[in-house]
């Protein structure tokens, strides 16, 4: 029985990456822009109903909600070639359409005011599922709607659907460019608190790294949002292939995540992908082997999260877990030999308190998407160096907070009125604790460190409790 997943796209960024994701899924399953199955899509074996359901006229509709506080991006989707794909009852745009003004507090407050309308949509989708497994939230952490309203929805989902998994694809801002959102550090910190406490898994999509990959690997001088969004949709679709083309393992979300997240708080994943699309067009077609793909996935230049670690810290960073999803014509003996070669060459530095092995899931490719390579791979990895990304967010927050800069923007809203800034302080403490825990993971004594935290034992079965019988 398929375990359905409902996708919730929040804000400008969330809806843009969500749209690219659905385009990719339609291509891979032979579904036309109007939701009707293409005449050539005659091969079975795929599970469309994890992400789609069929209307009475047999056309496929995404299990998706499109939510925004200003209409521009959603209007663009409704005027695009894909306008008939979505269920229009699942589109929410705020009546005033003024957006959140890149202010987390505004997005959160407006989320409180409209949550009943949005939860009605979510409940309706959930009731239409035979065996709902969970939710996927697409958003950014730096603006107003995706961060603030996304945070409120995360808390509400956690409360209302406590037994269901919540996974997010969270876009982190580009740290190499001057942001036009001056309060970005405040928004990011407040959102990170909710991602730590209210999500079961966060796939970190770091715009800094995505831009670097687009420039260095894809040879694009000035990557556009559309080009970096296509990288994101590649990662999102590849990370769901084992759910949509089921094999013996990792064919549901809880199985996928349980292998990657051994400890509840450390649930932030980084990704790597090879070979990349435009790269194949620029260079000559190369021979792709399982070993070649698996080795490339471990190279820093292919990893889609920037590490701000200094040299010494970088050498101490360790993998907590790795899952490689390999697509294409693959012989399992090649996988075994590749793993052996990687072990012999000591290419991976694992933690000392857990299973030190790369897990591999084999998945077939879509028969409807032609590629020039035989094998491609996605790496989902839990790696301690991600703490440096959080430390960077903390450092930027401290700079603004010391100057008491732009706090009046937040004091206008109920959570911060009467100059109550305790929400900032609490968020900072939670992220500092997260950084400390990722650092502790590098030590062989981490298990003891976990026991010192009184609440940890109670949370340890968090993922297990979401195994719905």
From Swiss-Prot:
CDD domains: gamma_tubulin. The keyword Nucleotide-binding applies. GO terms for biological process: cytoplasmic microtubule organization; meiotic spindle organization; microtubule nucleation; mitotic cell cycle; mitotic sister chromatid segregation; mitotic spindle organization. GTP binds at residues 142-148. This is Tubulin gamma-2 chain. PROSITE patterns: TUBULIN. Pfam families: Tubulin, Tubulin_C. Keywords: Cytoplasm, Cytoskeleton, GTP-binding, Microtubule, Nucleotide-binding. One of its GO terms (cellular component) is gamma-tubulin ring complex. Tubulin is the major constituent of microtubules. The gamma chain is found at microtubule organizing centers (MTOC) such as the spindle poles, suggesting that it is involved in the minus-end nucleation of microtubule assembly. GO terms for molecular function: GTP binding; microtubule nucleator activity. It comes from Oryza sativa subsp. japonica. PANTHER family: TUBULIN (PTHR11588). It is found in: Cytoplasm, Cytoskeleton, Microtubule organizing center. Belongs to the tubulin family.
């Amino acid at each position: 029985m398929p375990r359905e997943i409902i996708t919730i796209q929040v804000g400008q960024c969330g809806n843009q990456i969500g749209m690219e994701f659905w385009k990719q899924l339609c291509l891979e399953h032979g579904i036309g822009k109007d939701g009707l199955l293409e005449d050539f899509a005659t091969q079975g074996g795929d599970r469309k109903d994890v992400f789609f359901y069929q209307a009475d006229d047999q056309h496929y509709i995404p299990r998706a909600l499109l939510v925004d506080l200003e209409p521009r991006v959603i209007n663009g989707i409704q005027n695009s070639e894909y306008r008939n794909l979505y269920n229009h009852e699942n589109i929410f745009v705020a009546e005033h359409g003024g957006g959140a003004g890149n202010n987390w507090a505004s997005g959160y407050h407006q989320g409180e005011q409209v949550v009943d309308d949005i939860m009605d949509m979510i409940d309706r989708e959930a009731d239409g599922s035979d065996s709902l497994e969970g939710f996927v939230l697409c958003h950014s952490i730096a603006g107003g709607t995706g961060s603030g309203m996304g945070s409120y929805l995360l808390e509400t989902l956690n409360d209302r659907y406590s037994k269901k998994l919540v996974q997010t694809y969270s876009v982190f801002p580009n740290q190499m460019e001057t942001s036009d959102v001056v309060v970005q550090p405040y928004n990011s910190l407040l959102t990170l608190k909710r991602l730590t406490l209210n999500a079961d898994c966060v796939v970190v999509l770091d715009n800094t790294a995505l831009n670097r990959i687009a420039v260095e690997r894809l040879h694009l001088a000035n990557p556009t949002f559309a080009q970096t969004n296509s990288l994101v949709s590649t990662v999102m679709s590849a990370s769901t292939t084992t759910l949509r083309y089921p094999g013996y393992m990792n064919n549901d979300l809880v199985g996928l995540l349980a292998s990657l997240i051994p400890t509840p708080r450390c649930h932030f994943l980084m990704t790597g992908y090879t070979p990349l699309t435009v790269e194949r067009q620029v260079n000559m077609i190369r021979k792709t082997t399982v070993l070649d793909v698996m080795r490339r996935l471990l190279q820093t230049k292919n990893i889609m999260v920037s590490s701000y670690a200094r040299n010494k810290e970088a050498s101490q960073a360790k993998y907590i877990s790795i899952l490689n999803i390999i697509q294409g014509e693959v012989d399992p003996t090649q996988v075994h030999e590749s793993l052996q070669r990687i072990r012999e060459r000591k290419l991976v530095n694992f933690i000392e308190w857990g299973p030190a092995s790369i897990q591999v899931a084999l998945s077939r490719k879509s028969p409807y998407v032609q590629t020039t390579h035989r094998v491609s791979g996605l790496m989902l990895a839990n790696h301690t160096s991600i703490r440096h990304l959080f430390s960077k967010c903390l450092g930027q927050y401290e700079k603004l907070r010391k100057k008491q800069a732009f706090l009046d923007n937040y004091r206008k809203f109920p959570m911060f009125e009467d100059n109550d800034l305790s929400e900032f302080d609490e968020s900072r403490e939670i992220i500092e604790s997260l950084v400390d825990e990722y650092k502790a993971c590098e030590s062989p004594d981490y298990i003891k460190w976990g026991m010192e935290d009184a609440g940890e034992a109670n949370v340890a079965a968090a993922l297990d409790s979401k195994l719905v019988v």
